[in-house]
Structures are given as structure tokens and as C-alpha cells.
Amino acid sequence: MKETDITLEAILRCYQPDEQELIKYSYHLAEEALKDKVRENKKPFIEHPLGVAYIVSNEIGLRYESVAAVFLHEAIRFNPDILPQIPKGKFSDEIINIALSLNKIA
């Protein structure tokens, strides 16, 4: 599947409804942080984390926490001030640590 063809729904179908809610929340944080960003190919930057999340969910089969961390990573990367605005307990320490660790290598 081409990165430009990937939808959030293609990712969500791999998870249970309660898991989907957290993925959607983290996706919307990333979408907001990336709304004005475009890639070198002039496509919306949100395509990149969608592509990574698709690989994580559909090809590797990692748990929903990893998918949420992919989107949270991009949200924090482009808007570091967002982390303190997220309600306490919304994301587990595991998800936050994965996202912050990804920021170290991005």
C-alpha cells in the first residue's frame, strides 16, 4: 500500500474500540501539530506518521500503545508545548516514554 493511500481507518481496524479511542486521540494531536506542515513532495506531513503507524499496526502487529506513541511523537516533535496540555493519565508512562525516545532519534 502506498503511503498516500493509508487511512486512519486502515490502522484502527487492527484494534479494539477502547484502544481505537486512544489512537484517535493521539492522531488528532498529531494532525493539529502538523496541519501546516508539508513534506518535500508537497504532500501533507501527516502522511508520514500514518505510514509508520500502518507498518507498526498492520505489518509488524505491535500493540495499540505503539501506534499511539507514533502519533504522539510527531505531535510533541512539532509542538513541544503540547505535552503539559494533555490531561494527566490520558497516556500511560509507557506511551509517553516511547514518544519521547522516538524524538531523540528523529
Regions found by a protein language model. Give the residues of each.
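Active-site helical microenvironments for divalent-metal-assisted chemistry
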Residues: 1-106
